[in-house]
Amino acid sequence: MHIAKLAEKITGKPFYDGLTPRMTEEELETAVEFINEHFVFLESKDGGMATIDSVIDRTKQAVMRLGVRGLLIDPYNYIEQSGQEEHSGISHMLSKITSFAKAHGIHVWFVAHPQKMYPREDGTYSVPKGMNISGSAAWFAKADLGITVHRTDECVEIHCWKSRFKWVGQQGVSALSYDLPTGRYEQFTPRVELPSSLKGSQRDWSDFDDL
């Protein structure tokens, strides 16, 4: 499933049949070659829950043997907390992974989901940020960079709510469009509608055919 999703993003075409023409076998083969050259999937072979120590150990081997420079953990709650209280377990996990990342010069991404959000009086929801991530405020305190992918009816908003180092980025928001068949994002272009007072006054250009 992960390979299929990555192949869609690489080729810009869907993996499965649908309204949008799917990728060809040749395009899939090229995408898989790229994935094999740039990605390593760390899975628990015995089917058990991973611990942060087992993740670090396997990542260390990938760094030393394959030159891996980044680690994506999605989602974080698949990592067992070894009986610790959730807040303490998350704080301990983040401290360990931060020390490991600095020691080996790699970047680590965590995918985490917010706690239950409640609607405002107008029925809309506020954008979840670091303090709203389920489990612990340590997500905000210990992250170097934090972003939220927030979907609205019109677009997808990317909110940067923390950037520890100014040369990496700054707080702000950017609007993108999401292409469902391929999983790609692109710059959002708002739809512009004419005021109702002008809609009936548009000229039919066929009137000028004889000019």
Can you name each region flagged by the protein language model?
Residues 40-103:
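Phosphate-binding/switch loop-helix module in NTP-utilizing enzymes
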Residues 13, 17-18, 32-34, 49-68, ...:
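C-terminal regions of RecA-like/P-loop NTPase motor modules
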Residues 9-43:
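Nucleotide-state-sensitive switch-loop elements of NTP-binding domains
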Residues 2, 80-81, 119, 168:
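Conserved protein kinase catalytic core
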Residues 1-18, 75-80, 142-144:
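Walker A/P-loop NTP-binding active-site region of P-loop NTPases
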Residues 40-42, 109, 145-147:
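Hydrophobic/aromatic beta-strand patches that form the interior of the parallel beta-sheet core
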Residues 76, 113-114, 151-152:
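Short, ordered loop/turn segments at secondary-structure junctions
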Residues 72-73, 106-113:
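Structural recognition of the conserved hydrophobic beta-strand(s) that form the central parallel beta-sheet
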